[in-house]
Amino acid sequence: MAVGKNKGTSKGGKKGSKKKVVDPFTRKDWYDVKAPNMFSCRQVGKTLVNRTQGTRIASDGLKGRVFEVSLADLQNDTDAERSFRKFKLIAEDVHGRNVLCNFHGMDLTTDKLRSMVKKWQTLIECSVDVKTTDNYLLRVFCIGFTIKDQVSQRKTCYAQHSQIKAIRKNMTQIITNNVTSSDLKEVVNKLLPDSIAKDIEKACQGVYPLHDVYIRKVKVLKKPRFDLANLLELHGDGGGKGAEVSTGAAEGGVVVDRPEGYEPPVQESV
């Protein structure tokens, strides 16, 4: 055993025991998440990101984030028909403290899907890959269920295989016609009231009566090259700070968005 001083105990324990604990939230900033102007509620929420330090830029950490929001929140509506639809918004650019988002997909909640599946009926599904006029490649999923005819005395309402094929063909044709003739903004406007599903239900009445027909899911498979002008056009009609910036620029000056309690940095030389 070596005889000598224990340097660790003489200095008062382990190194770094009195290290100052820094709250990680002091290095972060809050940013407002903005939805495109297809929706009534433009202010979706807030998101955190580390402040810009050296080569790590805050806006790079925000781009590509996906936010999932209920349609009821986006439309400021308490209607039950809107609450089970979830829209995905992806952050594409950052302007000041605003994160500008674009449509990234749509889905139904799990509880809604599970509640529709019942006995004594036929479930009919289809999926189509379609391209919009502005070169977005979407995969659209549709779901529907057969319903018992009022005149029928049967307990069940199963469709024949030929009827299922005819219904699926109608679904594919209507989805293709609606999406290929529209750009992404028009497609989203059709998804809000689910007008495509209503057209399918009406068209299939002659084959076999359907109910609970919905566009179950929409995936964005491919996007065109990022265009800032198109994104700003999607966010152009909103009020608030965005409108202030545009009016200020029109008058010859620019309104700069600053956080609360902002103080300009001290200049070393003038």
UniProtKB/Swiss-Prot annotation:
It is found in: Cytoplasm. The keyword Acetylation does not apply. GO terms for biological process: translation. Its main location: cytoplasm. GO terms for cellular component: cytosolic small ribosomal subunit. Pfam families: Ribosomal_S3Ae. It comes from the Eukaryota. Belongs to the eukaryotic ribosomal protein eS1 family. This is Small ribosomal subunit protein eS1. The lineage of its organism: Eukaryota, Metazoa, Ecdysozoa, Arthropoda, Hexapoda.
